[in-house]
Structure formats: structure tokens, C-alpha cells
């Protein structure tokens, strides 16, 4: 049921249009950059004469931003909340925010990439990619196995980037993880959100990979920026529905040819984009705040929000 707290201020409808334009124009930036840029512009244009008035403007703009049908809406929500939390004590200049965070994470995780290791990667993560490229730049020799990552097949993008950097890479089907898991040293993935209990919300398929990794006693590492920390506590997969505005341009194809099945148009297709991985399946999280155990996430959230 709608309440007054969900009423949108039409004066800030422009933030959604601007956000979507920035995302389409700069596909390689994380959600943090346009979000911070837009909220900074809200501050510059605000006619508020008090901190409370400014906070109200920012909250109204943030409510509009959170309506964007964008598949990283959990991260977007976290960025908005953290920005408003620190707006009175943070500079409005964020020129290299994204780049600096990735460099720091790469440095902290560097010792985990040793010569000769084989790493399993799922989906496309800018932080994971930066971490791997940094290790290759240092002359480390390692190989990567990348899942196809349906339904958007983002694994192809990851594989292409790694191949362009002369990093040995192999692309596999999502269903082939259990077949190759004994050949990898550990799993490395990104996150759309890191929740209060140290679990993560990420690309669909992450949870089942973590289950396979644990069964074979393979470490499961997560690399993500701290702006993805969110005050949410999902207990199961269905709880994710309340955390996001899940959006995908089109559902996956059931088969290559209609002759392969009868009446394909009558099939009910479910193509979720995200799933929840509990903290018990995660070994460590690499963030710019440090290398954390899942149990340490709640402490960091307290520092960020309180």
C-alpha cells in the first residue's frame, strides 16, 4: 500500500532521465559515478537554507532515482543512502572515485593471485576485471575460466577483455561448473550488493557456484566496493524481490529452433537476474576498506551508517 513516504516529488523527475542518459553513454562506469554526480548537482541547484532542507531535497531526488528500472538498483539505493548520510562531511568533488577504489581493492587482493593459479569467474564485474588486469600487468601468470553467465551472457564480455590482455581464458557453459571445479584454485566474483549478514546479492547462478565450490572445498572470494554495502537482511531467495527493481530487456531463448519443442510460445519463462548467496558460502570479501570476513560486514555497516 502506498504511503506518503513513497510520494515522488515531480521537481526531481529530471534525475531519472539524466541517470539513464549517463548509463547509456558510459557503459563502463559503475552505478556510483552517475548517482553521486546527480546528487551533487541536486546540492548545487538546491535553494534550501538549512541542512534539513538540503537533506529533504536529496531524499526526494534519491526516491526518484530508485524508481529507475536498472538491474543494479540495490547498489543504486546503497549509494544514495550513503551519500545522504555523509553529505555534510564530504567534499563535492569525486573525480576518480571509481578508479581509486578499484586500484585499492586490486592492491589488497594482489597476494591472492599467485603464479600458476586457475580462477573461476562468473559474470562481468569491473572490480574483478581490474583486479585480474592489475595482476597480469605485474607479470603474474595465471589462467581464468569464465562462465557464459546467462541470461545476458555477460561472461563473453569478461572473456574478451581478458583475452585482449593476453590472459589465458576459457569460456564454459553455466551448467559446466561442477565438471571443471576440481581444476580451479578458487572462485572470484563481484557483487551487486553486500547485505548485513555478510552475504551477497549478485548475478544469477552465483549461489549455485558457491554451493559447488564449498562441496569441493574451494575458496569463494568476492570483490566489491563498499558503496554496495546495504542495510538489508534477506533470509532466502524470495526476499530479493523486495530489494530490487529487477529488469532485463528480454527473456532468454528456450531453444534454438521451434522444432525442438511443441508450442514454445505457451511455456512460462522465468528469467531472474540476481540471486542471494549466504555468508556461510563466502570465504573473504575484498573491499577498499580491507579484506573482510563475512562476519565483519555488520561492523563496517555500523561505521558507515551510524
PLM features: residue spans?
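Gly/Ser/Thr-rich loops at beta-strand to alpha-helix junctions
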Residues: 72, 118-129, 151
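Short, glycine-rich nucleotide/cofactor-binding loops
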Residues: 23-26, 44-48, 118-124, 196-202
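A short, well-structured juxtamembrane/interface segment
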Residues: 101-114
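Long amphipathic alpha-helical segments
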Residues: 1-100
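Conserved phosphate- and dinucleotide-binding cores of soluble alpha/beta proteins
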Residues: 2, 14, 129-130, 135-141, ...
Amino acid at each position: 500500500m502506498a504511503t506518503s513516504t513513497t510520494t515522488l516529488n515531480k521537481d526531481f523527475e529530471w534525475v531519472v532521465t539524466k541517470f539513464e542518459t549517463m548509463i547509456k553513454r558510459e557503459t563502463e562506469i559503475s552505478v556510483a559515478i552517475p548517482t553521486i554526480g546527480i546528487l551533487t548537482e541536486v546540492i548545487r541547484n538546491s535553494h534550501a537554507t538549512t541542512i534539513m532542507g538540503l537533506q529533504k531535497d536529496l531524499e526526494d531526488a534519491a526516491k526518484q532515482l530508485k524508481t529507475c528500472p536498472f538491474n543494479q538498483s540495490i547498489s543504486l539505493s546503497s549509494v544514495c543512502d550513503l551519500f545522504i548520510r555523509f553529505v555534510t562531511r564530504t567534499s563535492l568533488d569525486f573525480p576518480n572515485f571509481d578508479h581509486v577504489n578499484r586500484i585499492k581493492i586490486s592492491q589488497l587482493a594482489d597476494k591472492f593471485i599467485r603464479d600458476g593459479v586457475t580462477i573461476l569467474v562468473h559474470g562481468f564485474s569491473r572490480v574483478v576485471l581490474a583486479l585480474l588486469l592489475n595482476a597480469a600487468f605485474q607479470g603474474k601468470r595465471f589462467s581464468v575460466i569464465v562462465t557464459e553467465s546467462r541470461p545476458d551472457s555477460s561472461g563473453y564480455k569478461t572473456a574478451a577483455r581478458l583475452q585482449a590482455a593476453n590472459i589465458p581464458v576459457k569460456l564454459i557453459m553455466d551448467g559446466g561448473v561442477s565438471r571443471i571445479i576440481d581444476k580451479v584454485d578458487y572462485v572470484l566474483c563481484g557483487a551487486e550488493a553486500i547485505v548485513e549478514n555478510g552475504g551477497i546479492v549478485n548475478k544469477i547462478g552465483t549461489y549455485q557456484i558457491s554451493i559447488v565450490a564449498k562441496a569441493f572445498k574451494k575458496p569463494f572470494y568476492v570483490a566489491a566496493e563498499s558503496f554496495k554495502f546495504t542495510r538489508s537482511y534477506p533470509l532466502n531467495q524470495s526476499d530479493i524481490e523486495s530489494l530490487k527493481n529487477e529488469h532485463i530487456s528480454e527473456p532468454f531463448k528456450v531453444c534454438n529452433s521451434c522444432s525442438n519443442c511443441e508450442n514454445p510460445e505457451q511455456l512460462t519463462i522465468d528469467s531472474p537476474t540476481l540471486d542471494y548467496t549466504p555468508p556461510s558460502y563466502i570465504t573473504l570479501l575484498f573491499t577498499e576498506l580491507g579484506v573482510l570476513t563475512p562476519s565483519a560486514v555488520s561492523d563496517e555497516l555500523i561505521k558507515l551508517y551510524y
